[in-house]
């Protein structure tokens, strides 16, 4: 059987240079077509998706402890805790370092702030307890950049309280207008914007997510649709021109994921998807990395806000945010997307088969 190892893989996403930006503003007056998260997929790369799902399902009856032992034996580099992440004390910090190094984010920030006084300001959205913020402060010294950060995460949720080690005076936790830190309330994002409107905010990182029950783990992508859109929208509101955005994703097979990735290619100068080495090859996690924020046209922002407040009215429904054909007809984008999806899915499927084989009695 072929084998695969944990390693960083990076993909560039582009739109066709000959295609005009989509007429997003024309969509505002149209009613949203919604589907349940179970039905929020189409036939796009269906074979790859279902093959991956079937392989995952073979693990349903496997003891979780035995699975972890087999997984960590095969892929020891990405183990949890201090064994695999001595410098940061967590794996998340290493994942952030790897995606930033693979795409040149630090060098971009250095160019953006060259000759300017003051700190580079970042926002950590849905970031509690602060692994990304902690890593940014640590890494910034290597690149001779001074940083200040603002954070928003859910309040009074176990495990999400901000690390006490985050530097006082350089990091400000915020919880929005209602004090909850919940980005599903657009007013909380607006409150964070009001705090940072005069700041040179050049980086937004977003690592939000939630535990998905094992029996519906295949639907993690669509179950996470609302929080993904909210973090993506927050970056559009908070970033200054030229800024960068890093967002944790899962699978990217659904129409919603395609639309967000496609729209990003018009909103930023350069768009990547990275599967970092410390993100286990056996899982679907990957990161959207956008460099060089270009600004959001007014009609686009109005529509995105409307979509967030009306289209994502609950956690069970996924809206169709733009016509599927607008994305599918762009041959350049679709070629890039298919290559990324196929590579990550095939590596993940093979890695899971390796774990299953190791679990078989000798």
Curated annotation (Swiss-Prot):
Keyword set, alphabetical order: Methyltransferase, mRNA capping, mRNA processing, Nucleus, S-adenosyl-L-methionine, Transferase
Recorded catalytic activity of this chain's protein: a 5'-end (N(7)-methyl 5'-triphosphoguanosine)-ribonucleoside in mRNA + S-adenosyl-L-methionine = a 5'-end (N(7)-methyl 5'-triphosphoguanosine)-(2'-O-methyl-ribonucleoside) in mRNA + S-adenosyl-L-homocysteine + H(+)
Binding locations of S-adenosyl-L-methionine: 130, 207
EC numbers on record: 2.1.1.57
Function summary: S-adenosyl-L-methionine-dependent methyltransferase that mediates RNA cap1 2'-O-ribose methylation to the 5'-cap structure of spliced leader and U1 small nuclear RNAs. Methylates the ribose of the first nucleotide of a m(7)GpppG-capped RNA to produce m(7)GpppNmp (cap1). Cap1 modification is linked to higher levels of translation. Recognizes a guanosine cap on RNA independent of its N(7) methylation status.
Gene3D superfamilies: 3.40.50.12760
Catalytic site: 248 (proton acceptor)
Enzyme class: transferase
One family name in Pfam for this protein: FtsJ
Protein's name in the database: Cap-specific mRNA (nucleoside-2'-O-)-methyltransferase 1
Any one GO MF annotation of this record: mRNA (nucleoside-2'-O-)-methyltransferase activity
Listed GO CC annotations: cytoplasm; nucleus
Gene Ontology BP, a term: 7-methylguanosine mRNA capping
Transmembrane stretches, start-end: none
Subcellular location: Nucleus
